Amino acid sequence: MNPLIIKLGGVLLDSEEALERLFTALDSYRQQHQRPLVIVHGGGCLVDELMKKLSLPVVKKNGLRVTPADQIDIITGALAGTANKTLLAWAIKHQINAVGLSLADGGSVTVTPLDPALGHVGNAQPGSPLLLNTLLGAGYLPVISSIGITADGQLMNVNADQAATALAATLGADLILLSDVSGILDGKGQRIAEMTAQKAEQLIAQGIITDGMVVKVNAALDAARTLGRPVDIASWRHADQLPALFNGVSIGTRILA
C-alpha cells in the first residue's frame, strides 16, 4: 500500500487523553498492517500560548499566522522543538520507532517565501522522497514539523495542512487531515460526508465555512487536486474509528479531487 500521511492539528498537542488515544490507535494499526505512516504536525495552540506568555501579538491574515523576523526563532522552537519532541516522546512511550524531523531534512519539501506581508511564512512544494523512503523502508515513523528552510537558509513557518500536502506529493501518499472537528459541518452542524470544490465554494460564499476551516478546506481541495485522489478531514476524538480511517474508510468528510 502507498504511504499514509496523518496531519495532526488543533488542540491535540494540548490533550494527554487525545495523544494517548491517537498513539494507542497508531500502535495497534502498525502491529496489524504494513502500511508506512508519516505524521505531520503544526502546533498553533502551543505557539499562541507561548506568544501570550511573552506578551507578543498574534496576527492572522486569511487564517495564516503572520510571522515577523523577531518571532520566527520562537515559533521554530515551539514547533520543531517542543511540539515535535512531545510527539516523539509519545511514540517512544508506545514502543514506536520514530524519528523527529522538519520539512527541510533531506530536502523532503522545497520552501519559498509565500508573501512578504506575512513575514517568515513559507510556501511548500514537493521535494526529494529519498530520506523519507529510506526511513519508512527501515520501519521508522517520521514525525515532521511544519518548519521549513529556504534555499538561502531562512527559517520559515509553513501552514501544516499545506506542508502535509507537499509531503504527500513528494511520497505519492494518501493524506488525512486530523483536527478538532469530525469533518466539515453544514449550517445545522451536521457532518458533510463528501465535498466537491463546487460545494465548498458555495459554503464559503454562504459564510458556513469560515476562518481557519477555509484554509483547511482549501488545503484539502488543493491536496486532492495535486494528488489526484480524495483527501479525508476527520477528528482525532473518535480513536476507536482511527484504524478504519487509516485503512481508507471515511469517518469524517472526504474531499474529492
UniProtKB/Swiss-Prot annotation:
Record: residues binding ATP: 180-185, 208-210
InterPro entries: AceGlu_kinase-like_sf (IPR036393), AcgluKinase_fam (IPR004662), ArgB (IPR037528), Asp/Glu/Uridylate_kinase (IPR001048), NAGK-NC (IPR041731)
Domain of life: Bacteria
SUPFAM superfamilies on file: Carbamate kinase-like
Keyword Nucleus: no
Oligomeric form and interacting partners: Homodimer.
Name of protein: Acetylglutamate kinase
